[in-house]
């Protein structure tokens, strides 16, 4: 491994993965998604294919580019290891998303909405008939362009839920099983833990993550009212609890 690998993280471009991860970590901390050093982000460099990964144990609002780990996008070997820091325990999960989902970025948060939904729902989080669902990718493609189409507002958004493990790297096998069972999923909720979201670019992954957090927050409020989040549009009044 090169001893002078800082060139991999030195850039004045705010869109460079080493800089962008720091910006997003601060935003996610402010949203209460990544407090107490929890959560993580990884971004693939669009030109080099290198994988940039936020470290373990660093407060997200204080993250700096020199804290970044850099991984070879083909061999998955470390190209840069920041002195004194540990790699994220999520790294094997991020690598699996890159390898098997052709991800360009992965976001992992400890969102309260994701954790609460994992307590309410069983094996799947399901919600339908909400405008924000249109931000979530579907299993359909445009026949003329081949591009993945997003869900319609009245479609049902389904996000699988897996059980937590003592250590995050132990989630790799359940994650791989989820890839097989839900080949078009863009996220997985980990019960009592948080959520992993991936997309072809960091911009897409960020949008999906924000949309899902909105949908999960809404689902919790619907549950409090006695309304199943995946009930048919127009049927809500049948379920509203009488107080």
UniProtKB/Swiss-Prot annotation:
Positions that bind Zn(2+): 108, 110, 193
Entry function: Catalyzes the dehydration of methylthioribulose-1-phosphate (MTRu-1-P) into 2,3-diketo-5-methylthiopentyl-1-phosphate (DK-MTP-1-P).
Gene3D superfamilies (UniProt xref): Class II aldolase/adducin N-terminal domain
Active site (catalytic residues): 131 (proton donor/acceptor)
Keywords: Amino-acid biosynthesis, Cytoplasm, Lyase, Metal-binding, Methionine biosynthesis, Zinc
Enzyme Commission designation: 4.2.1.109
Entry's cofactor comment: Binds 1 zinc ion per subunit.
Localization (cell): Cytoplasm
Protein name according to UniProt: Methylthioribulose-1-phosphate dehydratase
Stored InterPro entries: Aldolase_II/adducin_N (IPR001303), Aldolase_II/adducin_N_sf (IPR036409), MethylthioRu-1-P_deHdtase_MtnB (IPR017714), Salvage_MtnB_euk (IPR027514)
Binding site for substrate: 90
Biological pathway: Amino-acid biosynthesis; L-methionine biosynthesis via salvage pathway; L-methionine from S-methyl-5-thio-alpha-D-ribose 1-phosphate: step 2/6
Top-level lineage group: Eukaryota
Gene that specifies this protein: MDE1
PANTHER family: METHYLTHIORIBULOSE-1-PHOSPHATE DEHYDRATASE
Any one of the GO BP annotations: L-methionine salvage from methylthioadenosine
């Amino acid at each position: 491994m090169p001893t002078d690998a800082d060139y991999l993280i030195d850039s004045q471009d705010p869109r460079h993965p080493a800089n962008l991860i720091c910006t997003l970590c601060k935003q996610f901390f402010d949203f209460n998604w990544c407090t107490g050093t929890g959560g993580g982000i990884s971004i693939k460099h669009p030109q080099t294919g290198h994988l940039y990964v936020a470290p373990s144990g660093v407060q997200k609002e204080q993250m700096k580019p020199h804290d970044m780990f850099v991984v070879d996008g083909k061999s998955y070997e470390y190209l840069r290891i920041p002195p004194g820091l540990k790699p994220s325990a999520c790294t094997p999960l991020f690598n699996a998303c890159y390898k098997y989902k052709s991800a360009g970025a992965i976001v992992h948060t400890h969102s309260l909405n994701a954790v609460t939904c994992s307590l309410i729902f069983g094996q799947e989080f399901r919600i339908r008939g909400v405008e924000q669902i249109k931000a979530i990718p579907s299993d359909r493609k445009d026949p003329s362009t081949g591009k993945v189409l997003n869900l319609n507002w009245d479609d049902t958004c389904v996000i699988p839920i897996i059980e937590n493990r003592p250590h995050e790297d132990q989630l790799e096998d359940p994650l791989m099983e989820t890839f097989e069972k839900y080949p078009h999923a863009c996220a997985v909720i980990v019960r009592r833990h948080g959520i992993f979201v991936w997309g072809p670019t960091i911009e897409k992954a960020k949008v999906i993550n924000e949309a899902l957090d909105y949908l999960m927050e809404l689902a919790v409020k619907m549950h409090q009212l006695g309304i199943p989040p995946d009930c048919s549009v127009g049927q809500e009044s049948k379920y509203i609890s009488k107080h």
